[in-house]
Regions:
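Residues at the N-termini of beta-strands
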Residues: 73, 226, 403-405
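A metal-dependent hydrolase metal-coordination microenvironment
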Residues: 31-216, 220, 231-249, 264-267, ...
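Bacterial N-terminal signal peptides that target proteins for export
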Residues: 1-11
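Bacterial N-terminal signal peptides
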Residues: 11-21
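Boundary at the C-terminal end of the N-terminal hydrophobic targeting segment
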Residues: 21-27
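C-terminal functional module detector
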Residues: 28-38, 53, 59-63, 258-269, ...
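Structural recognition of alpha->loop->beta junctions
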Residues: 217-236, 288-289, 293-305
Length: 436
């Protein structure tokens, strides 16, 4: 058997059980996403960097920041590394580490901090995940999860993926194309999950970082059902530009083709902050924490429960708006906002009709750019079915929809946006609508 054929068969063999283990929400389901009957909304960040890679603060400082800000869970996702084993950081060689050490001394007792050497050879020991967990996690109140940013590339193009809930390092696999790089990393993570039984969720990070990944490249990947719809890093181009589709447009393109043509599950859209710069305070500058997150509905605050809820679509993504409930009864989708005083809300219901026009054209007249840009499709894809002013809105399903999703936009400006002019938003995950 050739390597290429083995690669083609591996996803089907390994992923079929996972794709059916936690079914996605669809029109066959009637469901209510609300904090009742022992279920809780849990706010978390799934993309975080510390001094273990290219973040500029210590992991215990980060964990304390998110806990103090009311988060229920945090995933550490340093580049190609886990917070394990003994590691010492040379302070003189790491720019800005003096600020981090000062904060460490302000927030923790002297016996917590381990130093050795003097002058240019002075080093501080980085605390491991287990040490930080023991210090800061609170059962059923605040959870820390070990993760990793699998940092791969194809040529000069970055291909980054976050693994949530992994105790073993997932080395980048490489691949023969952008799609193949993503697929091979998914295959490796799936094989690890099958072997260990640990629920590891892998999501594709910031597709517009370096404008590396198109909707067409990502939509084909088997087993990748999550990507970053909103990433708080100011250099990842969530909104795209005149040639590059924004991530929300990519989302609709991918789900339209995955459902109608590729027979793949829905792609869910995550909100993250991709925190790196914990001492930057100027609005819109640096990759600061707290710009975007997910809110997951689960009964228990444990890694497996969080991953299971995400895989089932029992969550929403946010850059500031909080939801009270999402209700679906098979014939209508209702969204209820946890409204703030003196703030107005607009709720849009968005989707694509079944039988949509799949034709497209290149986004550039330059032949060399044709395959590097998401193609231009008709407005039938990702069209707005209804727009409602107010904190509560309901859309009645007609039966023509392939899927339906909702986005809530607030009149309140994001206090620290990744892109200028952002309003606070919340994104309800898409629901596949079956044939009537």
């Amino acid at each position: 058997m050739t390597n290429n054929r083995r690669r083609a068969l591996l996803p089907a063999l390994l992923l079929c059980s996972l794709l059916s283990a936690t079914p996605q929400l669809s029109a066959q389901d009637s469901f209510v996403l609300e904090a009742v009957d022992g279920q809780r909304w849990m706010k978390g960040n799934m993309h975080t960097h510390s001094l273990w890679s290219d973040g500029d603060d210590f992991p215990e400082n980060l964990a304390k920041w998110y806990r103090d800000k009311g988060y229920q869970f945090l995933v550490f996702t340093d580049h190609n590394t886990l917070l394990q084993k003994e590691r010492w950081l040379n302070l003189a060689k790491r720019k800005g580490s003096d600020k981090a050490l000062q904060r460490l001394r302000e927030q923790w007792p002297a016996e917590w901090i381990e130093l050795r050497g003097t002058g240019d050879t002075e080093e501080v020991r980085l605390k491991t995940f287990d040490e930080v967990f023991a210090k800061l996690a609170v059962p059923q109140e605040y959870l820390l999860i070990q993760g990793e940013e699998i940092t791969d590339r194809f040529g000069k193009l970055p291909v980054h993926m976050c693994a949530t809930n992994t105790a073993e390092l997932l080395p980048p696999t490489g691949g023969e194309s952008i799609t193949d790089v993503i697929q091979q990393n998914i295959n490796a993570a799936t094989a690890r999950r099958e072997r260990t039984g640990v629920r590891t969720l892998v999501h594709l990070n910031h597709p517009n970082f370096g404008y590396a990944i198109t909707a067409e490249q990502l939509m084909k990947v088997v087993g990748e059902n999550f990507f970053e719809l909103y990433n708080g890093h100011p250099g990842v181009h969530n909104s795209g530009d005149e040639k590059h589709a924004g991530t929300e447009r990519m989302w609709d393109i991918m789900n339209s083709f995955r459902l109608q043509t590729l027979q793949l599950p829905l792609m869910y859209g995550l909100g993250t902050d991709d925190g790196h710069n914990y001492f930057e305070t100027a609005s819109g500058k640096g990759a600061q924490p707290g710009r975007g997150w997910v809110v997951v509905l689960a009964r228990t605050l444990e890694p497996d429960a969080i991953v299971e809820a995400l895989e089932a679509g029992r969550f929403y993504s946010s850059s500031g708006v909080s939801l009270q409930a999402v209700r679906f009864n098979g014939s209508s989708l209702k969204v209820e906002v946890q409204a703030e005083a003196d703030v107005q809300y607009q709720i849009q219901f968005i989707g694509t009709d079944r039988g949509f026009d799949p034709e497209s054209r290149t986004a550039s007249d330059k032949p060399e750019e044709a395959d590097t840009l998401t193609r231009v499709y008709s407005d039938q894809i990702g069209k707005v079915y209804a727009t409602v002013a107010g904190p509560v809105a309901e859309y009645r399903i007609t039966g023509k929809e392939l899927y339906i999703r909702a986005v809530v936009t607030s009149s309140k400006r994001h206090p620290n946006p990744s892109e200028a002019g952002e309003f606070e938003r919340a994104w309800v995950q898409p629901i596949a609508i079956n044939n009537p």
